[in-house]
Design a protein with these regions (language model features):
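Basic, helix-initiating cap at the start of DNA-binding domains
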Residues: 1-22, 26
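N-terminal intrinsically disordered/low-complexity leader segments
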Residues: 1-4, 172-176
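Amphipathic alpha-helical linker/stalk segments
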Residues: 20, 27, 57-81, 92-93
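Short amphipathic alpha-helical segment with a characteristic S/N-K-E followed by hydrophobic residues
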Residues: 26, 49-54
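The alpha-helix within a helix-turn-helix
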Residues: 33
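Short hydrophobic/aromatic patch on the recognition helix
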Residues: 37-46
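Amphipathic alpha-helical packing segments from all-alpha helical-bundle domains
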Residues: 80, 99-137, 141, 171
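Hydrophobic alpha-helical segments that form the core
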Residues: 126-169
């Protein structure tokens, strides 16, 4: 493993540990580098800010599950999203605790936006941001709620619930 990757992993691991008991805005780069046993120069050779570290952590977690494989929508995507939240729930719960989940949601939107360029559906490509807000935003919020409430349902049950939500159509009362 090259030195840069090793440093990034050490910084990431240390930041997650610190976030377990301290909000991001109270963590300093000096404190992080001391706890990670690296120099500040090594930190700045790899990152500019603590937010960059969070982005790196999330990006790696995301790549491990999704592997840039979505050119169309499928139930597999929903299963992978649930798996991602299940596998990374410790990290995501820490982010929720310190109100940083919106930072990750924004980054998630950027990732999904890059996927939509490859979707076969022209309408989705033309209205990508609205689509992401409607579809992926809903999945992200459902999965966030699931882990924040202690994963009371199994991942299979959550998947079945989402499939049922997918079937529901908006019905307006015609009796008016």
């Amino acid at each position: 493993m090259n030195k840069s990757i090793k440093t990034k992993k050490q910084v990431s691991k240390t930041l997650i540990k610190l976030l377990n008991y301290k909000p991001l805005d109270l963590i300093t780069i000096k404190e992080l580098t001391e706890k990670a046993n690296i120099s500040r120069t090594a930190f700045y050779n790899n990152f500019h800010t603590l937010e960059d570290v969070l982005k790196y952590i999330y990006q790696n977690a995301h790549k491990q599950v999704f592997k840039d494989k979505y050119s169309h929508l499928s139930y597999e995507h929903i299963k992978d999203m649930i798996h991602f939240f299940d596998k990374n729930s410790k990290l995501l719960l820490v982010l929720i605790k310190w109100n940083l989940i919106e930072f990750i949601a924004k980054y998630n939107t950027e990732i999904v936006l890059s996927y939509t360029q490859h979707y076969k559906n022209k309408f989705i490509r033309e209205h990508a941001f609205y689509f992401i807000s409607y579809y992926h935003g809903s999945l992200f919020n459902i999965c966030t709620y699931w882990i924040a409430s202690g994963k009371q349902e199994s991942s299979d049950t959550l998947f079945k619930m989402i499939k049922e939500f997918e079937k529901i159509k908006f019905v307006y009362n015609q009796k008016g």
